[in-house]
């Protein structure tokens, strides 16, 4: 069973991600945070197998949190953001800062199975992956 921490300021997006993953037998969403500040404690408390992270959030953004996580042996991070479309500067920066992969938030509903497959690859692979 893979434990997932979902970090996104949008309640709707968090609900979509949670539903996609909880429909799978091998995933369990152990925490859901609307900010980096809320997520920090959850990372230590729940020790997730994988983290999904939005980039554009109030307060501390996802890029800064990627930098924080880089110095710790935490779970792989899958960035889920409308800013990380394939080939975008934000996608490149997220990967450079330690994200395992990126997925375009706008594609979650249409390509939910691809998202789940990417999360599954992130927890089982140590190399950088490509997302939608």
Model regions and ranges:
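Receiver (REC) domain active-site loop signature in two-component systems and cognate sites
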Residues: 57
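Active-site beta3 strand of CheY-like receiver
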Residues: 46-52
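Active-site residues of response regulator receiver
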Residues: 8, 54
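Acidic catalytic/metal-coordinating carboxylates
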Residues: 35-38, 61-64
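Two-component/phosphorelay signaling modules centered on CheY-like receiver
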Residues: 2, 11-31
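Alpha4 helix (beta4-alpha4-beta5 surface) of REC/receiver domains from two-component response regulators
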Residues: 64, 83-117
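Short amphipathic alpha-helix used as the core "switch/output" element in two-component signaling
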Residues: 63-74
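Receiver (REC) domain switch/output surface
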Residues: 112-132
């Amino acid at each position: 069973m893979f434990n997932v921490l979902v970090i996104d300021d949008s309640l709707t997006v968090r609900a979509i991600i949670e539903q996609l993953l909880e429909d799978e037998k091998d995933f369990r969403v152990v925490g859901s945070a609307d900010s980096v500040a809320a997520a920090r404690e959850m990372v230590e408390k729940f020790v997730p197998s994988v983290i999904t992270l939005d980039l554009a959030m109030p307060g501390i953004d996802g890029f800064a949190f990627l930098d924080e996580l880089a110095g710790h042996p935490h779970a792989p991070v899958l960035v889920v953001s409308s800013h990380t479309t394939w080939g975008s500067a934000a996608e490149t920066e997220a990967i450079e800062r330690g994200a395992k992969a990126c997925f375009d938030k706008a594609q979650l509903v249409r390509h939910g199975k691809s998202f789940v497959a990417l999360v599954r690859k992130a927890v089982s692979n140590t190399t950088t992956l490509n997302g939608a």
